[in-house]
Amino acid sequence: MAFQTQGSNLRALLVEDIKVNRMILSQMLRKFQVETTVVQNGKEAVELFLGGETFDIVLTDNLMPIMTGPEAISKIRAMGATDVMIVGVSVDANSMEEFKDAGADLCVPKLKLEILEHILQETRSKKNKSSA
C-alpha cells in the first residue's frame, strides 16, 4: 500500500519493509520537503513504475518479502528508467555489491541527514539540468 507526502519539486520512492525504518526515512525526506511515496517491498515499487509513475530518486532496502531491492532495481532499469537516481540502503557489505550489480547509482550503509541532503542536492541539480 503506497502513501504520499507532498512538498518540493522532487519525487521520491521509499521502498522499505520495516515500519520504524519507513517512519524514520519518511521524516528525513519530509524535512527536505520531498514528495514521497512509500511502499513495503520491491514488487510494489516495480508495479508503480509499470503503472507509469515517475520518480527522481528511489531509496530501497535490500532484504524484503516478495521482492528484494536489487531484484526491483534490475526490473526498474530494464523498463528503461535510467534517469532516476537509485540508492541502496543497507549495513551489509554483500548488499552493497548486490545493489551495484543490479544498477543502483549509489549504496549507503546508513542514511544520515547530511548524506541524504547531499544526495537530494545532486538529484535536484541533475533534474534541473535535464529540464533546462
Swiss-Prot record:
A single GO BP term for this record reads:
cytokinin-activated signaling pathway
Record keyword Phosphoprotein present: yes
- Indicate whether Phosphoprotein appears among the record's keywords: yes
Cite the Pfam families for this sequence: Response_reg (PF00072)
Q: Kindly provide the PTM information from the record.
A: Two-component system major event consists of a His-to-Asp phosphorelay between a sensor histidine kinase (HK) and a response regulator (RR). In plants, the His-to-Asp phosphorelay involves an additional intermediate named Histidine-containing phosphotransfer protein (HPt). This multistep phosphorelay consists of a His-Asp-His-Asp sequential transfer of a phosphate group between first a His and an Asp of the HK protein, followed by the transfer to a conserved His of the HPt protein and finally the transfer to an Asp in the receiver domain of the RR protein.
Q: Which residues carry this modification: 4-aspartylphosphate?
A: D61
Please report the stretch or stretches of sequence annotated as the Response regulatory domain: 11-125
- Give the record's keywords alphabetically: Activator, Cytokinin signaling pathway, Phosphoprotein, Two-component regulatory system
PROSITE patterns per the record?
RESPONSE_REGULATORY
Give the UniProt family note: Belongs to the ARR family. Type-C subfamily.
Role description: Functions as a response regulator involved in His-to-Asp phosphorelay signal transduction system. Phosphorylation of the Asp residue in the receiver domain activates the ability of the protein to promote the transcription of target genes. May directly activate some type-A response regulators in response to cytokinins.
Please identify the protein, giving its name as recorded.
Two-component response regulator ORR42
Give the species.
Oryza sativa subsp. japonica
